[in-house]
């Protein structure tokens, strides 16, 4: 289920899974020039990994 769900004009972060077991998510942010950056990740028994 949803663990994190944040959304505003400059930043968005969504995370799903089971806290303490396995989660996956993504976040998006904008720099001062309006460029968008997106990162998808997973965190589980193997550690935190960017996809």
Swiss-Prot record:
Keywords attached to this entry: Cuticle
GO molecular function, one term: structural constituent of cuticle
Keyword Heme: no
Taxonomy, superkingdom: Eukaryota
Pfam family of the protein (one): Chitin_bind_4
Tissue-wise expression: Calcified shell.
Domain Chitin-binding type R&R: start-end pairs: 1-51
KW Cell division (keyword) present: no
Protein name: Cuticle protein CP575
Organism annotation: Cancer pagurus
């Amino acid at each position: 289920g949803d663990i994190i769900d944040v959304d505003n004009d400059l930043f968005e972060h969504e995370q799903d899974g089971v806290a303490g077991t396995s989660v996956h998510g993504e976040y998006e942010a904008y720099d001062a020039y309006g460029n968008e950056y997106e990162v998808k990740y997973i965190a589980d028994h193997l550690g935190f990994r960017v996809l």
